[in-house]
Structure formats: C-alpha cells, structure tokens
C-alpha cells in the first residue's frame, strides 16, 4: 500500500495566510477607527463648534 502524495498544501497555506492577513487587518482597522479615530473627530468637531459659537457671540456684540 503506497502513501498518497501530499498535494495542495502550498496552495492551502497561501490561501490560509492571505485569509488570516485580511481578517487581522480588517479587525485592526476597525479597532483603530472606533477606538482612536472617532473620538478624535468628535473632540475636533466640538472644538470647532465652540470656536464658531465664540466668534458669533463676538460678532453680535
């Protein structure tokens, strides 16, 4: 009884590596977006809203 040759392992490894890479990249990008980026945008928008309100108060006075 002969042992069957191992075929397709390189292709399977490449597909697995690419899939894991995309999954990890997507997870890290999503984490960055919601943990780091969104709070910075909220803080910046609040600052500019406050600045605009101050300028409007000075212009109307």
UniProtKB/Swiss-Prot annotation:
Primary location class: mitochondrion
Domain of life: Eukaryota
One Gene Ontology biological process: mitochondrial electron transport, cytochrome c to oxygen
Topology term for the membrane: Single-pass membrane protein
Compartments it resides in: Mitochondrion inner membrane
MF terms in GO: cytochrome-c oxidase activity
Segments in the Mitochondrial intermembrane topological domain: 37-56
Disulfide-bond pairs as recorded: none
InterPro entries according to UniProt: Cyt_c_oxidase_su7a_fun
Keywords linked to the UniProt accession: Membrane, Mitochondrion, Mitochondrion inner membrane, Oxidoreductase, Transmembrane, Transmembrane helix
Pathway(s): Energy metabolism; oxidative phosphorylation
Chain ranges passing through the membrane: 14-36
Proregion span(s): 57-61
GO cellular component: mitochondrial inner membrane; respiratory chain complex IV
Keyword Nucleotide-binding: no
Mitochondrial matrix compartment spans: 1-13
Primary role: Component of the cytochrome c oxidase, the last enzyme in the mitochondrial electron transport chain which drives oxidative phosphorylation. The respiratory chain contains 3 multisubunit complexes succinate dehydrogenase (complex II, CII), ubiquinol-cytochrome c oxidoreductase (cytochrome b-c1 complex, complex III, CIII) and cytochrome c oxidase (complex IV, CIV), that cooperate to transfer electrons derived from NADH and succinate to molecular oxygen, creating an electrochemical gradient over the inner membrane that drives transmembrane transport and the ATP synthase.
The family this protein is said to belong to: Belongs to the fungal cytochrome c oxidase subunit 7a family.
PANTHER family hit by this protein: CYTOCHROME C OXIDASE SUBUNIT 6C, CYTOCHROME C OXIDASE SUBUNIT 7A
Assembly mode: Component of the cytochrome c oxidase (complex IV, CIV), a multisubunit enzyme composed of a catalytic core of 3 subunits and several supernumerary subunits. The complex exists as a monomer or a dimer and forms supercomplexes (SCs) in the inner mitochondrial membrane with ubiquinol-cytochrome c oxidoreductase (cytochrome b-c1 complex, complex III, CIII).
Name of the molecule in the record: Cytochrome c oxidase subunit 9, mitochondrial
Biological classification of the source: Eukaryota, Fungi, Dikarya, Ascomycota, Saccharomycotina
Protein encoded by which gene: COX9
